[in-house]
Amino acid sequence: MSYDHVIYERRGHVAYVTLNRPERMNALDAHSHAELIEIFDDFERDPDAWLAIITGAGDRAFCAGNDLKATAQASANGEQRVGRDARFAAITRSYDCPKPLIAAVNGVAAGGGL
């Protein structure tokens, strides 16, 4: 499956997850969170995926955290979401994943990107 803001690849038993918004320092918006939720749900259920490595595209940032510009725009448009619909904490919402997750931090890691 292909995604807009995240690259997901499986090589052997390793899942590679790349945050792919280098022009926004890989900041996470609601769409990114939705994609990450789907990716990590699939990863957790896949018996052939033994571990995941998450990194950021580009050379400036691993992840700048929440995309504040997108959040402000959504709020101005009346699209503010709360609870599970907010799509935040895509990775950390499930602390009981039995598989290792490795963060290959390459550059800035701030806020929720840390």
Enumerate the language-model features and the residues they cover.
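Short, active-site-adjacent cap segments at secondary-structure transitions
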Residues: 59-63, 110
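Conserved CoA-thioester-binding segment of acyl-CoA-metabolizing enzymes
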Residues: 1-55, 59
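Active-site-proximal glycine-rich helix-loop-beta segment
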Residues: 112-114
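An acidic, glycine-rich surface segment that forms the CoA-thioester-binding/catalytic face
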Residues: 35-41, 68-106
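Phosphate-coordinating loops and pocket residues in cytosolic domains that bind phosphorylated ligands
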Residues: 27-30, 64, 73
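A short, acidic beta-alpha loop adjacent to the nucleotide-sugar donor pocket found in many GT-B
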Residues: 25, 106-108
